[in-house]
C-alpha cells in the first residue's frame, strides 16, 4: 500500500468568469493572504469527518491560486486500493503512462478541487479568523478550471500544468520538498461508507459532468499526459472479465419494456391514424348530390380533378339559375351532410389472441335497436293505424312531392303569382303539365289552409279541378311561356272547398297537426341510432 500520494491543481482561475458572486476572489485582496504554508485539512466533499490529508501550500501564480497537498490517511488509501481492484475503469490501459489503478480510481471518483474560504465581502475588512479553512476533493468543482492531478511524485504532478511557468514551478517545488510527510499528523478519517456512497450517487446525476471536466482541463491548461478521465476513455480491459448472460445484438439501449395494455393502446392509436378518411365533396349549387331534369334525376358534376365527369343531361335541358328568389334545393331522403361513412372493417389482422373485434359489439347493439323498432311496429299495427289514401292523379302527386323541381328556361324566367294575389303560400313554383294537344295548363297552387283532408281533389285529364282555366297557346309561340293570371276574383281555396265533396263524418281522419307519420318517426329513430354509432 502506498505511504502517501501527492495532489495538485488550481483552486481558482483568475481569467475564468464566475457565475456566482460568492465564488469570486479578488486577486488584489487575496494576494495579501498568500502563500499559505501552514497545513490545511484535505477532506472529501466538504464533510468534516472525511479528512484524508493535508495541504502543502497555496500559492499565487499568474494563472490563479495553485494548491499542492498530500493524501496520508491509511484508512482512505486502503479503501481506494480495494475499489481499484474491483473497478474496470481503474484497470483500463492509458497511453504513454504506466498502469496505476490507484491513481485511476482517484481521478475517476474525485477529479475536482474545491476551496473553502470566507465570503468575498469580508475581505474588504480585516478578517477575525483564517481566510482559508480547507480544500476538498470532489466530483466536480463549482469554479471552472479546478481539476486535480494525483501522482506519486510532487514534481511530476506540478509539471502536468503548462499554465505554471518554470519560475513559479521551481518556487512551489522548493517549498514542497522542505515538507516531510512523516511530520504530518494522521488525518481523522472516520466517515462511514454509506456517506461516501451517497455522495458518489449524487455525483452521478450531475448534468454534463464529463463535458465540464473536459472544460476544466482546458482552462487549467493540462497538456501533458495524465490519468484524468476527462479526455481519455477505456478502450479495453487488461484482466479477464467474468462471464455475463448473452444479450441481443441490439443492446440494452435499444430495448424497452412497457405494459401490455400500454402497447395495445399505442398499437390501436397507430391503426386508427392509418385509416384514410373520405375526401370531402365540394358544395354544389344545385343540391346535395342530384339535380332535377323533368321526370329524371342526374348526378351533379363535382369540380374535382380526381373524379370522372358525369353523363350530361338530355338535349334541350336548361340548367336552373340557382340565384332565383324561388329556387329550392331539397334534401334527399337518407342523406346526411358532413358525416363520414363507416368504412369496412378489416377482418384479416390487427387482433391479438383473446381480443374481441369491435364490430361484434356494433352488430349486437344494432340488433337490439332493430328488435326495439320491430316491437314498435307491432304496437302500431295493434293500435289500428291506417295510412291515408294516395293521390289520385299525377298532377296532385307532383303538387305534394317535397322533392320536385320544375323544368324552366333560365333565359326567359316566368312571372308567377304572388301570395297576395291568391291568398295562399307557395312552397314551389306552379307546375306546368303538357296536355295531349301540345298546350300547357296551370295546376292549382299548393295551399296551407286545409287542416283536415279526407279526399284529394278530383282531376279531369291532366288538369286539377278548381284550378283557374288556362287559355290555349299556339304551338308556334312556345318560345316564351308566361303565366296566366286567374280571371275570377274568388280565392282558389274557396273553389276547392266548393267543388270538394262533403266529408263523411264516420270516415277515418288523419290529423296532420297532431300526429306525425310513422314512417318518418321510424326513419328518424334509425338515423339517430346510426349517428350515435359514428
Curated annotation (Swiss-Prot):
One of its GO terms (cellular component) is host cell nucleus. It is an enzyme of class 3 (hydrolase). Transmembrane segments: none annotated. One of its GO terms (molecular function) is identical protein binding. InterPro entries: Herpes_virus_sf, Peptidase_S21. Residues 337-356, 466-524 are annotated as: Disordered. Residues 479-491 have a biased composition (Polar residues). Residues 514-534 are annotated as: Interaction with major capsid protein. The active site is at 46 (charge relay system), 114 (charge relay system), 134 (charge relay system). The keyword Isomerase does not apply. Its EC number is 3.4.21.97. The keyword Transmembrane does not apply. A motif (Nuclear localization signal) lies at residues 336-342. The record marks 230-231, 512-513 as: Cleavage. Residues 253-272 are annotated as: Interaction with pAP. Keywords: Host cytoplasm, Host nucleus, Hydrolase, Phosphoprotein, Protease, Serine protease, Viral capsid assembly, Viral release from host cell. It comes from the Viruses. GO terms for biological process: nuclear capsid assembly; proteolysis; viral release from host cell. Belongs to the herpesviridae capsid scaffolding protein family. Region of interaction between pPR and pAP is called Amino conserved domain (ACD). The region of interaction with major capsid protein is called carboxyl conserved domain (CCD). This is Capsid scaffolding protein. It comes from Human herpesvirus 8 type P (isolate GK18).
Amino acid at each position: 500500500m502506498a505511504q502517501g500520494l501527492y495532489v495538485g491543481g488550481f483552486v481558482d482561475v483568475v481569467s475564468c468568469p464566475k457565475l456566482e458572486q460568492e465564488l469570486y476572489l479578488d486577486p488584489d485582496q487575496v494576494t495579501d493572504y498568500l502563500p499559505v504554508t501552514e497545513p490545511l485539512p484535505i477532506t472529501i466533499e466538504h464533510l468534516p469527518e472525511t479528512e484524508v490529508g493535508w495541504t502543502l501550500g497555496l500559492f499565487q501564480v499568474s494563472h490563479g491560486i495553485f494548491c499542492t497537498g498530500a493524501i496520508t490517511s491509511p484508512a482512505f488509501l486502503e479503501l481506494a486500493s480495494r475499489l481499484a481492484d474491483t473497478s474496470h475503469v481503474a484497470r483500463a490501459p492509458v497511453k504513454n503512462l504506466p498502469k496505476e489503478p490507484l491513481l485511476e480510481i482517484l481521478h475517476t471518483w474525485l477529479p475536482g478541487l474545491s476551496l473553502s474560504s470566507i465570503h468575498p465581502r469580508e475581505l474588504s475588512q480585516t478578517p477575525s479568523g483564517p481566510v482559508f479553512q480547507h480544500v476538498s476533493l470532489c466530483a466536480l468543482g463549482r469554479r471552472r478550471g479546478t481539476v486535480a492531478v494525483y501522482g506519486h511524485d510532487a514534481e511530476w504532478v506540478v509539471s502536468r500544468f503548462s499554465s505554471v511557468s518554470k519560475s513559479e514551478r521551481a518556487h512551489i517545488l522548493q517549498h514542497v520538498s522542505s515538507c516531510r510527510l512523516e511530520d504530518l499528523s494522521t488525518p481523522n478519517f472516520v466517515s462511514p461508507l454509506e456517506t461516501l456512497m451517497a455522495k458518489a450517487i449524487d455525483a452521478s446525476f450531475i448534468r454534463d459532468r464529463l463535458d465540464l471536466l473536459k472544460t476544466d482541463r482546458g482552462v487549467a491548461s493540462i497538456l501533458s499526459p495524465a490519468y484524468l478521465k476527462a479526455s481519455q476513455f477505456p478502450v479495453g480491459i487488461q484482466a479477464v472479465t467474468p462471464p455475463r448472460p448473452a444479450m441481443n445484438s441490439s443492446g440494452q439501449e435499444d430495448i424497452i419494456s412497457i405494459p401490455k395494455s400500454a402497447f395495445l393502446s399505442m398499437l390501436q392509436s397507430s391503426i386508427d391514424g392509418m385509416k384514410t378518411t373520405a375526401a370531402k365533396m365540394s358544395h354544389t349549387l344545385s343540391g346535395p348530390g342530384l339535380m332535377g331534369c323533368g321526370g329524371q334525376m342526374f348526378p351533379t358534376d363535382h369540380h374535382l380533378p380526381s373524379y370522372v365527369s358525369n353523363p350530361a343531361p338530355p338535349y334541350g335541358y336548361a340548367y336552373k339559375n340557382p340565384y332565383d328568389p324561388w329556387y329550392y334545393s331539397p334534401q334527399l331522403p337518407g342523406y346526411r351532410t358532413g358525416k363520414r361513412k363507416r368504412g369496412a372493417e378489416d377482418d384479416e389482422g390487427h387482433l391479438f389472441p383473446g381480443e374481441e373485434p369491435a364490430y361484434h359489439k356494433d352488430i349486437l347493439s344494432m340488433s337490439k335497436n332493430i328488435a326495439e323498432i320491430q316491437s314498435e311496429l307491432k304496437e302500431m299495427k295493434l293500435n289500428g293505424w291506417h295510412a291515408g289514401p294516395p293521390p289520385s292523379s299525377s298532377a296532385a302527386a307532383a303538387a305534394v312531392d317535397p322533392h320536385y323541381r320544375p323544368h324552366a328556361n333560365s333565359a326567359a324566367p316566368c312571372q308567377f303569382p304572388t301570395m297576395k294575389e291568391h291568398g295562399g303560400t307557395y312552397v314551389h313554383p306552379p307546375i306546368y303539365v303538357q296536355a295531349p294537344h301540345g298546350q300547357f295548363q296551370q295546376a292549382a297552387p299548393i295551399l296551407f289552409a286545409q287542416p283536415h283532408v279526407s279526399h284529394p281533389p278530383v282531376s279531369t285529364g291532366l288538369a286539377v279541378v278548381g284550378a283557374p282555366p288556362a287559355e290555349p297557346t299556339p304551338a308556334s309561340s312556345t318560345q316564351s311561356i308566361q303565366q296566366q293570371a286567374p280571371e275570377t276574383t274568388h280565392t282558389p281555396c274557396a273553389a276547392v272547398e266548393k267543388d270538394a265533396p262533403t266529408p263523411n263524418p264516420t270516415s277515418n281522419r288523419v290529423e296532420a297537426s297532431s300526429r306525425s307519420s310513422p314512417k318518418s318517426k321510424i326513419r328518424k329513430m334509425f338515423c339517430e341510432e346510426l349517428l350515435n354509432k359514428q
